Amino acid sequence: MSTFPAEPRSDIVNGHVESDFNYQTGTWSEPVFVQDHYLKVHGLAPGLNYGQQVFEGMKAYRDPNGQIQIFRPTDHALRMQRSCDAVSIPSIPESLFWASVNLAVAKNSEFVPPHASEAAMYIRPLAFGSGGWMPVAAGPQYKFVVYALPFCAYHGTLPVDAVVLEELDRAAPLGVGNVKVGGNYAPVLKWSDKARKEGFGITLHLDSKTRGEIDEFSTSGFVGIKYTESGGEKGYTLVVPNSQCIIKSVTSTSVVEVARSLGWRVEVRPIPYDELEFFDEVLAVGTAAMITSIRSITHRSKDQVFRYKTSDEPGSACEKLSRHLKGIQKGDEKDTFGWLKRVEEVTV
């Protein structure tokens, strides 16, 4: 008799999960597991033609007992609902979201990396207008899918150099920069590819209205760290932007809560561009990026380069936050926040 979860394997995943929206009943279908890597989609689907699509990114880890835990699924479900509302996709109930994510991971459980590995299983929920529909209006057919695959940190583990992206505004003040839609990412690809060829691992966005405040990195949230000292002991102040044009990052929120639990001071507020020179560390944080140290930030038109207290190794704040956050995610530290949800076996 086989055991659940299955032991890790080294080949590709088994398939994905699908659910379809029934416009006559106004409900989503029960999720089904499809043993295929491809979707059958109408060529005139609004998701392909008009960008009517939203997505999420989340992770599953094996704990020390071999069980599989998913990190903060409720937060991702709620964020996906906000994204759906922004582009007129029917809301995906939290119960359906969890059932679909659980099914996708359970049916691919042998591909969740071992506990001792630095890798995890990346989970990609995606929803889009799927039927043939020519009008520039919300159509009647939608599809919700969940993919999963083994994954390592997007930017690696070493500090990276960043550059301010001046050629493109990521989001307008009353736009959709605060939700996860593909249109926020595709226009950046050209510039991030160019930046990588020039030696910059990541691009940073300033606010589009004044270009005087920090918004976020193209792939992740921005966190600034200032060192403090009291009684001969080093302390930390963590500063994160509260711009209305940025994604509500689940990882950034988690970092803030971990920092507070460690007794660090936390400031959530607008961050002026001119404050960059006063940070001791800068971090890029996100589900795919994890917590990445920023070695430097370059602003070309101003001929400025801000260098931080990191060279070939992450700074002390980055190391502490990464250790505690990863410890919770992998079950090595007690989950006092209630962030983890265990994947249950699916027999059908």
UniProtKB/Swiss-Prot annotation:
Residues annotated with N6-(pyridoxal phosphate)lysine modification: K180
UniProt keywords, alphabetically: Aminotransferase, Pyridoxal phosphate, Transferase
Residues of the signal peptide: none
GO molecular function: branched-chain-amino-acid transaminase activity
GO biological process, one term: branched-chain amino acid metabolic process
Chain positions recorded as pyridoxal 5'-phosphate binding sites: R79, E216
Origin superkingdom: Eukaryota
Phenotype seen when the gene is deleted: Eliminates approximately 70% of aspercryptin production.
This protein's record includes keyword Transferase: yes
Pathway annotation: Secondary metabolite biosynthesis
EC number per UniProt: 2.6.1.-
Listed cofactors: pyridoxal 5'-phosphate
CDD domains in alphabetical order: BCAT_beta_family (cd01557)
Job of this protein: Aminotransferase; part of the gene cluster that mediates the biosynthesis of aspercryptins, linear lipopeptides built from six amino acids including 2 highly unusual and nonproteogenic amino acids, 2-amino-octanoic acid (2aoa) and 2-amino-dodecanol (2adol). The core structure of aspercryptins is as follows: Ser/Ala-Thr-Ile/Val-2aoa-Asn-2adol. The first step of aspercryptin biosynthesis is the generation of the fatty acid precursors, octanoic and dodecanoic acids, by the FAS subunits atnF and atnM.
Record protein name field: Aminotransferase atnJ
Species, as recorded: Emericella nidulans (strain FGSC A4 / ATCC 38163 / CBS 112.46 / NRRL 194 / M139) (Aspergillus nidulans)
